[in-house]
A protein has these predicted regions:
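Start-transfer (signal-anchor) and selected internal transmembrane alpha helices
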Residues: 1-42, 244-249, 331-354
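Membrane-embedded helix bundles of polyisoprenyl
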Residues: 119, 123-136, 143-189, 196-229, ...
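Membrane-interface micro-motifs in multi-pass membrane enzymes
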Residues: 88-93, 114-123, 153-181, 212-216, ...
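Periplasmic/ER-lumenal interhelical loops and adjacent helix-loop junctions
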Residues: 51, 256-330
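Membrane-interface helix-loop junctions at the exits of transmembrane helices
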Residues: 31-35, 148-166, 257-266, 283-296, ...
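Signature aromatic-anchored transmembrane alpha helix within multi-pass, membrane-resident enzymes
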Residues: 141, 145, 226, 250-251, ...
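Membrane-interface coil-to-helix junctions
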Residues: 27-124, 157, 167, 171, ...
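Perimembrane helix-loop-helix junctions
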Residues: 219-251, 326-337
Length: 575
């Protein structure tokens, strides 16, 4: 009998999860189509998607693919030579890059997996949303219906769409959604049965994965692990076991960080700029982001401070309506069922406290509503500590998800008092989803059209140019002589990666690599002295420097000079 119940319980989870995944895939195809799924087509990356970050992520992967295997596994000695760097600092999703590096012997020179990974993120987000929404309803039919609708709703969260492709690693929001599900389900099992569920061991797994996908997701997963430990201690009085659970998640994150290089790689983290990329107080209702998209068919874009585009947390009109309805229902419940509300707060105050703290961190000490605001002075040591996560607006992702879950649970809970609760909850949730889809329909069309145009328009830049094609033959490195233009930096790194070359270009976003800067200066000095390495391809974005090279090496017939996309090259024809 017990085995039958367990099988039935698994079935009730699996079916909504599969339907949620299908909903997530459908949303991806609606928004982007199939264009980004072509692994050999990287023109859209070479054009840049909303900004240049995706070029950095792609360059990090390509150069890492050419790197020697070493420890940590995410170390790329082909970037920022001579010391190299870890690809956690190029935001190239270390675990995914490591997996594909194992296949490098059979992969073509141009190979981008960002489309398929993002499709997976939508599927997993739909799965997590389905599990979160379906856990509060009985019966496999109702779970399936709510799972499908809930999965689609979570796949239609604007924060997922905004990060997808612009900053692919940050589309992995399924990490903290699954962590939230594990926490809530484990707490429920412990409360109902008194047994500590095995499901909780997924929290260390998620912590391990998070640190090797993007470090910003680690605090959000660890918050869920901490909430579970607190509630385990509160419910069972087993504070030793609770501490062990949290320590296990922390240890898993540490091991993962050491393996991929996010922790202990010897590169100092940037600690400046806390508050620069914070969340504006109007973020939940502000459909304003990079790319100038029309995120809402009803609401207008509101002003932001410079840098607060990264604190984008617009919820979508459907979720906003859901929250307003849930708030009204909660106020009514406060007066009609005060004891039930008191019990709810007793059960959930740790979650509310965690969300409040994350919100404060996301807003930062630069507190603004639009253009009106003030700055709270903080000691420098605290600013430096918070600066490790300087893009603080991302920390609101978990509170936003908690708000959406609370709205769904409140709506479904209210429907239980009606004559046909299953039909009522399904219809209302479908209406919420319909409003959300309607509100986001314009931005969906804009993003779909962007990829359609990218497919139709040919691209020619330094990373995809007839003059630079094949320069890796017989050469080992692409060396910049001095600093290069920022708008060519990542494209040159992509070129090096495609051609199988290492480079002294530094494309990492955190920390300092003084050795690579010195190498670029030494390279310039070497050429000025009349010497060069025949195995190197030299590049500058300063035409006057390139003309000097031609004068210095005027009698050397082994060298050739050419220009591609405002980048000036010198290389040995027969190295």
């Amino acid at each position: 009998m017990t085995n039958q119940l367990q099988k039935r319980d698994r079935f009730r989870r699996i079916l909504p999860a599969l339907l949620g995944a299908a909903a997530g895939i459908a949303v991806f195809l609606w928004v982007y189509g199939t264009a980004p799924l072509h692994t050999g087509w990287d023109n859209w990356i070479l054009q840049g998607y909303d900004e240049w970050d995706v070029q950095q992520h792609y360059a990090g992967w390509l150069l890492f693919r050419n790197a020697h295997w070493s420890f940590p596994l995410g170390m790329a000695d082909t970037i920022a030579v001579p010391d190299g760097t870890v690809i956690s600092y190029t935001d190239s999703l270390p675990w995914v890059s490591i997996f594909f590096k194992l296949l490098r012997g059979v992969l073509p020179a141009a190979f981008q997996w960002f489309g398929w990974y993002t499709l997976g993120c939508f599927a997993l987000q739909g799965t997590a949303g389905a599990l979160l929404c379906a856990r509060c309803v009985p019966g496999w039919k109702q779970k399936s219906a709510v799972g499908l609708l809930g999965g689609a709703l979570f796949a239609c969260l604007p924060t997922l769409w905004e990060r997808a492709f612009r900053h692919t690693a940050l589309a992995s929001q399924w990490l903290f959604l699954f962590a939230m599900y594990v926490y809530l389900e484990s707490r429920c099992t412990l409360h109902l049965t008194g047994r500590t569920p095995r499901l909780r061991w997924w929290l260390p797994v998620l912590a391990f994965v998070a640190v090797g996908i993007h470090p910003y997701f680690l605090p959000l997963v660890m918050v869920c692990a901490l909430l579970w430990s607190i509630d385990r201690g509160r419910l069972s009085r087993d504070w030793k076991g609770a501490a062990t659970d949290f320590a296990s998640a922390l240890a898993a994150a540490l091991v993962g960080g050491l393996l991929c290089g996010a922790i202990g790689s010897g590169t100092s983290l940037s600690r400046e700029g806390y508050g620069e990329f914070s969340m504006n107080l109007n973020a939940l209702i502000n459909p304003s982001s990079r790319g100038g998209y029309t995120w809402s068919r009803l609401l207008s874009a509101l002003p932001l401070q410079a840098g607060q585009y990264d604190g984008f947390n617009y919820l979508g009109l459907g979720v906003l309506v859901l929250l307003v309805v849930a708030l009204v229902l909660s106020v009514v419940a406060f007066f009609r069922r005060p004891q039930a509300v008191k019990n709810w707060w007793h059960r959930n105050w740790p979650v509310a406290a965690a969300c409040a703290l994350l919100t404060l961190f996301a807003v930062s000490n630069h507190v603004y509503w639009g253009n009106m605001g003030f700055t709270i002075p903080l000691p420098q040591w605290l600013l430096n500590l918070c600066g490790i996560f300087r893009s603080s607006g991302r920390m609101f992702y978990l509170p936003a998800a908690c708000l959406a879950v609370w709205g769904v649970y409140t709506l479904i809970g209210t429907c239980r008092s009606l004559s046909r609760p299953a039909v009522c909850s399904g219809v209302l949730l479908a209406l919420v989803l319909a409003v959300q889809v309607w509100d986001l329909s314009t931005v969906a069309a804009e993003k779909h059209d962007w990829f359609d145009r990218a497919m139709a328009e040919p691209v020619e830049n330094v990373a995809f140019h007839s003059m630079t094609s094949g320069i890796g033959a017989g050469h080992t490195s692409l060396l910049a002589a001095g600093e290069v233009r920022d708008d060519r930096l990542r494209l040159l790194a992509i070129l090096a990666g495609k051609e199988g070359l290492s480079t002294n270009l530094d494309i990492a976003v955190s920390g300092s690599r003084d050795a690579s800067a010195m190498n670029r200066a030494d390279t310039a000095a070497l050429l000025q002295s009349g010497s060069y390495d025949p195995s190197a391809v030299y590049v500058t974005t300063d035409e006057s420097v390139w003309l000097q090279w031609q004068q210095i090496f005027a009698g050397d017939d082994a060298l050739t000079f050419f220009v591609a996309d405002s980048c000036y090259f010198m290389l040995c024809l027969n190295p």
